[in-house]
């Protein structure tokens, strides 16, 4: 009897949660956790998370991190009530005088905008004009709130800024939105400073954006455009001065509820609109990128009434932190990250990450320390730690000073060799696996005939891998006088056990805790049985 073979070498479709398994592409997965997608085709264990601060930040309710490139690089953090700063390790509160912390009065947290080597901070507190801060200074300097006092063009004085909830630098001006002027709230107002003078504002230099619900919820600059978010609309400010500024509606359906739900990338912005999902804007059009994850909304796996969906752009990928739960009990904090890589495939690729203590990460930035070393930094959703991500040399998370293991698995789509009608005897498959740097075991669960419920696997076997002592391993091998870099140098072929008689099969690979692993290819072997009428 002829033995058929099929080799799967492409896994770049990533995670796709659509309920109908027949819609999955050959390179997509219905279930994966803490594995990264290799652009060249394989999957492998994600990098570890490592906390940068040994001292826990108190009263933890993080909003966002901000990269401040002043005289010395600093990490700024907006909590629910205070502003913190760090040079790469522990955090301290930012004060405006000895013993006086900057207080935040906005539910959105602090607004940050860098102008030259100066950081401007809005607090959203009535009567407070915000602060300016330089990294060389011990304290921030208070600014006087605009309204009732404004500065004519002919006599700028400096030292002023509107009381606002959002800040952005655009067209050589400082923009402030959702303002409070002389104790009167103007939630739909956008003000801008004099040209080149971020501390002076003219009385009539503002626009009120009334459509899309009450209150401006975010400002982002994309491709020379100032994007103004409302709860149910998105607007674009075109022009370059008070005489030419005009508002154009980009969408009257999409919007955000908090600035945490939008992140600026290198060439555009990503945002979450409820209930429409994740979207991307490149300066010309809005693209829906939520198709692969639509069931999480349809099945009510997200509860954003307790926590917003947080969006970060870290290490050239989008990290969507969501309160995700499939148990029927609403999650009160971000439990996972759906990580989207726009560089893989035309539609981009998703995977799902979760920390070793079962939480997501949020408020992320790309940051570079004074030595020029780059880090992807994010806030832990539950404990007062800021962590670096994508540490591929680490096999565990270190969130509290002690390393801890995280769960990893990857499940294939159903494989039916072209026909689910015909039964097949699935023989021993071959696997091309990434060679480990330490002995490890991968557990393979085999499911039959579209019965994919957890615990219903028909067979289970192990793939045992040991590093080749004669092979040149990255980081340890020396060739002549040159020492090689980091990472596994090769792959190994391992044969599994029979998969059994079935119409179709599905495999789930689960890695050993605390060990790296990866798959480059799956080679199926099968013998088709005669079809009975």
Residue map of PLM features:
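Beta-propeller and closely related beta-pinwheel folds
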Residues: 48-62, 92-106, 143-308, 351-354
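Beta-sheet repeat architectures centered on beta-propellers
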Residues: 1-120, 253-269, 273-533
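A short, charged
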Residues: 116-120, 124, 129-131, 161-162, ...
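Short beta-strand segments and strand-loop junctions that repeat across beta-rich extracellular domains
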Residues: 82-88, 130-145, 181-200, 237, ...
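Generic beta-strand hydrophobic packing signal
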Residues: 65, 128-131, 136-143, 167, ...
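Hydrophobic or amphipathic alpha-helical targeting/insertion segments
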Residues: 107-153
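A conserved positional marker within WD40/Gbeta-like beta-propeller blades
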Residues: 82, 127-129, 233, 277
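Short, solvent-exposed loop/turn segments at secondary-structure junctions
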Residues: 126, 181-182, 514
């Amino acid at each position: 009897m002829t033995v058929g073979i099929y080799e799967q070498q492409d896994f770049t479709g990533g995670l796709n949660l659509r309920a109908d398994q027949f819609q999955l592409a050959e390179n997509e997965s219905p279930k994966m956790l803490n594995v990264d997608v290799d652009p060249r085709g394989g999957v492998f264990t994600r990098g570890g998370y490592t906390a940068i601060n040994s001292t826990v930040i108190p009263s933890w309710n993080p909003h966002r991190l901000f990269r401040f490139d002043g005289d010395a690089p600093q990490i700024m953090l907006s909590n629910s009530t205070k502003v913190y700063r760090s040079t790469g390790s522990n955090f301290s509160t930012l004060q405006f005088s000895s013993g006086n912390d900057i207080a935040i009065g906005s539910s959105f947290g602090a607004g940050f905008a860098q102008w030259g080597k100066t950081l401007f901070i809005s607090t959203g507190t009535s009567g407070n004009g915000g602060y300016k801060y330089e990294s060389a200074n011990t304290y921030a300097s208070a600014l006087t709130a605009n309204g009732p006092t404004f500065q004519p063009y002919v006599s700028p004085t400096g030292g002023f800024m509107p009381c606002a909830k959002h800040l952005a630098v655009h067209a050589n001006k400082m923009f402030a939105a959702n303002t409070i002027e002389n104790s009167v709230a103007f939630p739909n107002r956008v003000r801008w400073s004099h040209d080149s003078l971020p501390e002076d504002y003219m009385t009539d230099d503002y626009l009120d954006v009334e459509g899309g619900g009450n209150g401006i919820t975010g400002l982002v600059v994309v491709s020379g455009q100032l994007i103004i978010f409302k709860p149910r609309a998105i607007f674009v400010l075109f022009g370059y001065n008070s005489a030419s500024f005009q508002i154009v509606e980009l969408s009257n359906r999409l919007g955000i509820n908090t600035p945490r739900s939008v992140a600026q990338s290198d060439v555009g912005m990503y945002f979450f609109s409820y209930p429409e999902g994740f979207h991307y804007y490149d300066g010309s059009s809005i693209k829906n990128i939520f198709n692969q994850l639509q069931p999480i909304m349809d099945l009510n796996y997200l509860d954003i009434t307790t926590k917003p969906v947080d969006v970060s752009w870290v290490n050239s990928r989008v990290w969507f932190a969501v309160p995700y739960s499939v148990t029927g009990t609403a999650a009160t904090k971000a439990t996972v990250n759906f990580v989207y890589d726009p560089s893989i495939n035309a539609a981009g690729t998703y995977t799902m990450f979760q920390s070793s203590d079962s939480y997501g990460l949020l408020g992320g930035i790309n940051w570079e320390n004074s030595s020029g070393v780059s880090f992807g930094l994010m806030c832990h959703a539950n404990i007062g730690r800021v962590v670096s991500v994508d540490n591929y040399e680490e096999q565990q998370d270190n969130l509290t000073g002690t390393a801890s293991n995280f769960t990893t698995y990857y499940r294939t789509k159903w494989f039916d060799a072209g026909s689910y009608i015909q039964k097949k005897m699935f023989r021993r498959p071959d696997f091309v696996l990434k060679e480990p740097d330490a002995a490890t075991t991968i557990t393979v669960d085999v499911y039959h005939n579209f019965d994919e419920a957890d615990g219903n696997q028909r067979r289970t076997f192990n793939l045992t891998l040991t590093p080749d002592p004669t092979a040149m391993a990255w980081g340890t091998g020396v060739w002549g006088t040159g020492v090689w870099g980091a990472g596994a140098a090769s792959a190994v072929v391992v044969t599994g056990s029979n998969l059994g008689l079935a119409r179709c099969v599905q495999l789930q690979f689960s890695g050993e805790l605390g060990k790296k692993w990866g798959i480059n290819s799956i080679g199926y072997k099968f013998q088709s049985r005669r079809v009975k009428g």
